[in-house]
Amino acid sequence: MAKRDYYEVLGVNRDASDNEIKKAYRKLAMKHHPDRNPDNKDSEDHFKEAKNAYEILSDAQKRAAYDRYGHAGVDPSAGAGPGGQGFDGFADAFSDIFGDIFGGAGGAGRGRSNVYRGADLRYNLEISLEEAARGADKTIRIPTVEECETCHGSGAKPGTQPKPCPTCGGAGQVRIQQGFFSIQQTCPKCHGTGRIIPDPCRDCGGAGRVKRQKTLEVKIPAGIDEGMRLRHAGHGEPGVNGGPPGDLYVEIHIRAHPVFQRDHDDLHCEMPISITTAALGGEIEIPTLEGMARLKIPAETQSGKVFRLRGKGIRNVRSQAHGDLMCHVVVETPVNLTERQKELLREFEEVSSSDADRHNPKAKSWMDKVKDFFGA
């Protein structure tokens, strides 16, 4: 499984200060510490992941290498490119062995250009329910890194050039002898680039890249739901040594709506009606995303009744089908009554008491169940 971005692991921005990184790590460490979560494998994995991220981002040199090269700049096992060593690294090790024994060229990885794909970026975008339903065009500004215009990405002061790394001779990897085995690892001095920069560029500090704010237009498709991600290929961080750029993933979050609650393509809303309308029936106005609509309420409607308005929900993001609007009836008990209103209600109670079972069937059914329960 590919490693997660260390900034994402700690939940901080790429331009976070050392103090912000430390606070984020402490919070995660306390939450997932093994002493607090015994026998919890997920918490143990989260704890280790946060610890690894903090070890890199809390060290200025390692952080600079990570910002420039991603995991490949700080993890020797990533020297074979994104995703770690994999089968190719295994084959390289045996190639080195047979090369040493038989005097062959060996080291299939020697002289590699150390080209790396740029890191992916993630942006959380909050939109309204109406925008999610109808679609929208949004403009976002994302923090990213771009090639330094002063040194054109070389990292060296104008008029100077990077030099071959004296440790690896420019190969980007070093050979380590372990008994009969000869293996290769990413050079710890140049972090796999095969070069060092004696006179760093003043504008980028030798990184070859600088932090920037990038403006991007994002098209939100109609019907998009909470947590869905929009991929913008090539809008991540630039690659290293001519490698392809990463991608930008825009994750959608929908603000809570004062009237509607969403359930996939369906919408739900509460519909308060008066006792009179519930008892006698009537016609009321209800809100939809397209405007107000009229709904007939039949007589003797009870609280909790659900009316379905077909096609008044949200269009499915992958088809033209629409969800429904579910209106949940809430019969309101009148408040702040005048004396005359109270008198009329008491009068209604008196004239209804002689035939209460017929007028209140649910109450009778409930009382019958209570009597059966107590054996009355």
From Swiss-Prot:
<feature type="zinc finger region" description="CR-type">
    <location>
        <begin position="135"/>
        <end position="213"/>
    </location>
</feature>
<protein>
    <recommendedName>
        <fullName>Chaperone protein DnaJ 2</fullName>
    </recommendedName>
</protein>
<dbReference type="GO" id="GO:0006260">
    <property type="term" value="P:DNA replication"/>
</dbReference>
<feature type="binding site">
    <location>
        <position position="204"/>
    </location>
    <ligand>
        <name>Zn(2+) 1</name>
    </ligand>
</feature>
<keyword id="KW-0235">DNA replication</keyword>
<dbReference type="GO" id="GO:0051085">
    <property type="term" value="P:chaperone cofactor-dependent protein refolding"/>
</dbReference>
<feature type="binding site">
    <location>
        <position position="187"/>
    </location>
    <ligand>
        <name>Zn(2+) 2</name>
    </ligand>
</feature>
<feature type="binding site">
    <location>
        <position position="165"/>
    </location>
    <ligand>
        <name>Zn(2+) 2</name>
    </ligand>
</feature>
<dbReference type="Pfam" id="PF00684">
    <property type="entry name" value="DnaJ_CXXCXGXG"/>
</dbReference>
<feature type="repeat" description="CXXCXGXG motif">
    <location>
        <begin position="187"/>
        <end position="194"/>
    </location>
</feature>
<dbReference type="InterPro" id="IPR001623">
    <property type="entry name" value="DnaJ_domain"/>
</dbReference>
<feature type="repeat" description="CXXCXGXG motif">
    <location>
        <begin position="148"/>
        <end position="155"/>
    </location>
</feature>
<dbReference type="GO" id="GO:0009408">
    <property type="term" value="P:response to heat"/>
</dbReference>
<feature type="binding site">
    <location>
        <position position="201"/>
    </location>
    <ligand>
        <name>Zn(2+) 1</name>
    </ligand>
</feature>
<feature type="binding site">
    <location>
        <position position="168"/>
    </location>
    <ligand>
        <name>Zn(2+) 2</name>
    </ligand>
</feature>
<comment type="subunit">
    <text>Homodimer.</text>
</comment>
<dbReference type="GO" id="GO:0042026">
    <property type="term" value="P:protein refolding"/>
</dbReference>
<dbReference type="GO" id="GO:0031072">
    <property type="term" value="F:heat shock protein binding"/>
</dbReference>
<dbReference type="Pfam" id="PF00226">
    <property type="entry name" value="DnaJ"/>
</dbReference>
<keyword id="KW-0963">Cytoplasm</keyword>
<keyword id="KW-0677">Repeat</keyword>
<feature type="domain" description="J">
    <location>
        <begin position="5"/>
        <end position="70"/>
    </location>
</feature>
<dbReference type="InterPro" id="IPR036869">
    <property type="entry name" value="J_dom_sf"/>
</dbReference>
<feature type="repeat" description="CXXCXGXG motif">
    <location>
        <begin position="201"/>
        <end position="208"/>
    </location>
</feature>
<dbReference type="Pfam" id="PF01556">
    <property type="entry name" value="DnaJ_C"/>
</dbReference>
<comment type="similarity">
    <text>Belongs to the DnaJ family.</text>
</comment>
<dbReference type="InterPro" id="IPR018253">
    <property type="entry name" value="DnaJ_domain_CS"/>
</dbReference>
<keyword id="KW-0143">Chaperone</keyword>
<keyword id="KW-0862">Zinc</keyword>
<feature type="repeat" description="CXXCXGXG motif">
    <location>
        <begin position="165"/>
        <end position="172"/>
    </location>
</feature>
<keyword id="KW-0863">Zinc-finger</keyword>
<dbReference type="GO" id="GO:0008270">
    <property type="term" value="F:zinc ion binding"/>
</dbReference>
<dbReference type="GO" id="GO:0051082">
    <property type="term" value="F:unfolded protein binding"/>
</dbReference>
<dbReference type="GO" id="GO:0005737">
    <property type="term" value="C:cytoplasm"/>
</dbReference>
<dbReference type="GO" id="GO:0005524">
    <property type="term" value="F:ATP binding"/>
</dbReference>
<dbReference type="InterPro" id="IPR036410">
    <property type="entry name" value="HSP_DnaJ_Cys-rich_dom_sf"/>
</dbReference>
<feature type="binding site">
    <location>
        <position position="151"/>
    </location>
    <ligand>
        <name>Zn(2+) 1</name>
    </ligand>
</feature>
<dbReference type="InterPro" id="IPR012724">
    <property type="entry name" value="DnaJ"/>
</dbReference>
<feature type="binding site">
    <location>
        <position position="148"/>
    </location>
    <ligand>
        <name>Zn(2+) 1</name>
    </ligand>
</feature>
<dbReference type="InterPro" id="IPR002939">
    <property type="entry name" value="DnaJ_C"/>
</dbReference>
<comment type="function">
    <text>Participates actively in the response to hyperosmotic and heat shock by preventing the aggregation of stress-denatured proteins and by disaggregating proteins, also in an autonomous, DnaK-independent fashion. Unfolded proteins bind initially to DnaJ; upon interaction with the DnaJ-bound protein, DnaK hydrolyzes its bound ATP, resulting in the formation of a stable complex. GrpE releases ADP from DnaK; ATP binding to DnaK triggers the release of the substrate protein, thus completing the reaction cycle.</text>
</comment>
<keyword id="KW-0479">Metal-binding</keyword>
